[in-house]
Amino acid sequence: YMENLETFIRVAREHSAYPVLITPLERRCFMDEKHLGIGAHSDYVAAMKQTAEKNNVPLVDLYSMSRMELKKAGEKNSRRWYMFFPEGEYKNHPEKSEDNTHLRYDGAVNFASLIAKGLREIGGIYAELLLDDLKL
């Protein structure tokens, strides 16, 4: 995994691009209303952080930010961000869904805003790529 990340970094730099690593989004893994279990991606997050530091590449820690958002929202309220809906709600997806991985529109917007926040915090060329205010 780390070698693969380093290949992406090297190729990006060879093409005059500015690499940035973004840790994976946390899955919904609540043990109760406010407490998350150990995330499914924690080993990948640690490896990515190590690779970013070793290669002097900025990192947006979406994993940590999304865990904080999930804890703040709680088990029940965070369902609105993921593919949780009752049977018959959607014509093209008539069956019930309790998907703790894939996002609905509101979840995608919410977590993308965390990535934008992270890029702004890095600053420089990364922040310059962002619009000041986007109305969705």
What are these regions (language model features)?
Residues 132-136:
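A short, charged, Gly/Pro-tolerant segment at domain boundaries
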Residues 1-109, 113-131:
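Alpha-helical cap/lid subdomain in secreted, periplasmic
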